[in-house]
């Protein structure tokens, strides 16, 4: 009888701790992911305002909240389509990982899908209308996503170790 109660107590205590840790981890990870999307969308809005180009700021006066190096760190490309969805031009000058042909292929795939925002692999994309048709803009989010996934893995590993530690402590204390 006592062994049965002891077992139930250990299971309930460890389950409660696991539930709380999973809830906390879930909230933190969701907030982190939303921040990645928000930052990417802000950068993309700035690029859209400048017709798919990174704006030039006055010397020594970067945009508030932006590093003067952001212009050189931001990897993006844009493809311009006419109203019937045919490619007019592509700007791949700010990315080395994607050739112009690939950029056009990605843009046509997104344009045909009818979606305005989302991810295509590690690229956050946005479709905006222009006077000639549409601009499909892609922003490389690989660094941010890589950090997010490493944080997620580390969080789960630490949580698993923590839950196991609580299990051992509760198990030992329940025998007294």
Q: Residue locations for each model-derived region?
A:
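Cytosolic-side ends of inner-membrane transmembrane helices, especially those
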Residues: 25-33, 158, 162-176
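Extracytoplasmic
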Residues: 96-156
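Juxtamembrane segments flanking the first transmembrane helix
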Residues: 1-86, 146
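N-terminal membrane-entry
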Residues: 11, 145-169
């Amino acid at each position: 009888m006592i062994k049965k109660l002891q077992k139930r107590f250990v299971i309930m205590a460890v389950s409660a701790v696991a539930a709380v840790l999973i809830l906390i981890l879930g909230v933190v990870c969701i907030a982190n992911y939303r921040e990645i999307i928000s930052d990417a969308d802000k950068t993309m809005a700035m690029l859209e305002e400048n017709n798919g180009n990174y704006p030039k700021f006055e010397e020594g006066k970067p945009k508030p909240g932006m590093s003067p190096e952001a212009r050189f760190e931001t990897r993006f490309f844009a493809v311009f389509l006419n109203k019937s969805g045919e490619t007019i031009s592509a700007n791949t000058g700010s990315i080395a990982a994607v050739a112009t042909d690939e950029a056009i292929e990605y843009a046509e795939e997104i344009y045909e899908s009818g979606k305005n925002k989302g991810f295509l692999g590690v690229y956050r994309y946005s479709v905006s209308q222009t006077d000639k048709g549409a601009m499909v803009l892609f922003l490389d989010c690989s660094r941010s996503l890589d950090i997010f996934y490493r944080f997620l893995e580390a969080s789960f590993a630490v949580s698993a170790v923590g839950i196991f530690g609580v299990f051992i402590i509760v198990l030992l204390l329940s025998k007294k």
